[in-house]
């Protein structure tokens, strides 16, 4: 950010699993910004230390100024709206962020796969519903940027993502 003279406006979370939020306390200290998480995942973020211990990770401190949002929240970045799409299943408060023709999908939708549902609060039925009835209703040309691995498009995933793909 310093290199480009950019200023951070938000610290937004697609969900509150430790592998996505471990550096947020430091980011918050550097920027003074609150951390935003869906209201259904706030407890996960507040209990970051317990999550990290479960996975054998060392010290993990949760951020202090945590703000919640719901599916009706819209963030702005310049003249662009960032829309929240609540996609429970990986966690109860999993969300995707849609802005323009880009979707930040966190751990809900991956290239050829979906997020795990075997952690506490996960639900295969919910993630399936989120993908089929929310994400797959979006324009097929939207580029999906998952929380891990390669980007994809809504159209590609509708066609090929097992068990949802038309070609399976």
Question: What is each PLM-predicted segment?
Answer:
Residues 6, 51-54, 81-168:
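Metallo-beta-lactamase
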Residues 2-76, 159-163:
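Active-site HxH/HxHxD metal-binding segment of metal-dependent hydrolases
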């Amino acid at each position: 950010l310093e290199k480009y003279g950019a200023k951070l406006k938000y610290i937004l979370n697609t969900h509150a699993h430790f592998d996505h939020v471990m550096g947020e306390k430091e980011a918050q200290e550097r920027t003074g910004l609150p951390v935003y998480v869906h209201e259904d995942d706030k407890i996960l973020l507040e209990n970051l230390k317990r999550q990290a211990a479960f996975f054998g990770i060392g010290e993990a401190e949760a951020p202090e100024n945590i703000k919640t949002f719901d599916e009706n929240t819209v963030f702005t970045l310049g003249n662009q709206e960032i829309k929240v799409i609540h996609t429970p299943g990986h966690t109860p408060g999993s969300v995707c962020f849609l802005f323009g023709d880009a979707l930040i999908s966190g751990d809900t939708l991956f290239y050829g796969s979906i997020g795990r549902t075997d952690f506490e609060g996960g639900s295969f039925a919910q993630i399936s519903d989120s993908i089929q009835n929310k994400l797959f209703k979006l324009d097929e040309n939207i580029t999906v940027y998952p929380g891990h691995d390669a980007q994809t498009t809504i159209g590609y995933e509708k066609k090929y993502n097992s068990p949802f793909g038309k070609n399976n």
